Amino acid sequence: MRRLTLLLMLGLLGCGKAMPVDVFRSTTPAMDPIRFFTGHVRSWGVLEDRSGEPTSIVTTDCLGESDGDTLRMVQQLTIGRDAPTTRTWQMQRVGPNRYEATANDMVGTATGEASGRAFRWTWTLALSPGNDLKNVSMDQWWYLLDDGSMLNRTTVRKLGVILIEVTEHFAHVSS
């Protein structure tokens, strides 16, 4: 029943207006992004173009250190056969279930909110020099699963138009 409820809620994400994260408030386990990304975490996923066609495999390798309400994480991101890029995150809890973050390829500050097993945040990604799009909007939903792993769904937009969607599975790596 829990899976059916989660799948129905995920399905609502595809509908026009953004779903509020507090829809998930009564779900468990509770998502704490600082706790989740502390340690060694890897992801595997797929990047889809605007028509929903898979175009690339996405992998990340994340190493995070936390100190209470603060996380510093180095993320190696590989898309398809491209060379890996490094994103360095600084995340901070700024209130009950509220978070902010910066990263070396981010414009401004990411803002996010956790509720139950879900976390949603939005931020602006600065693309590499020479890319005509310059910046794109990132809308990320993270769902903590019963086994302690996480599902990520990211929608990348420019001027409100969906360019890319990414689905990833994140899991802790044993030492």
What is the predicted role of each segment?
Residues P54-T60, L133-M138, I162-I164:
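Amphipathic hydrophobic-ligand
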Residues F37-G45, N152:
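A short, Trp-centered hydrophobic/proline-enriched beta-strand micro-motif
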Residues G16-A18:
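Bacterial signal peptide processing site
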Residues R2-L7:
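Sec-dependent signal peptide recognition
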Residues W44, E48-P129:
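Central antiparallel beta-sheet cores of small beta-barrel/beta-sandwich binding domains
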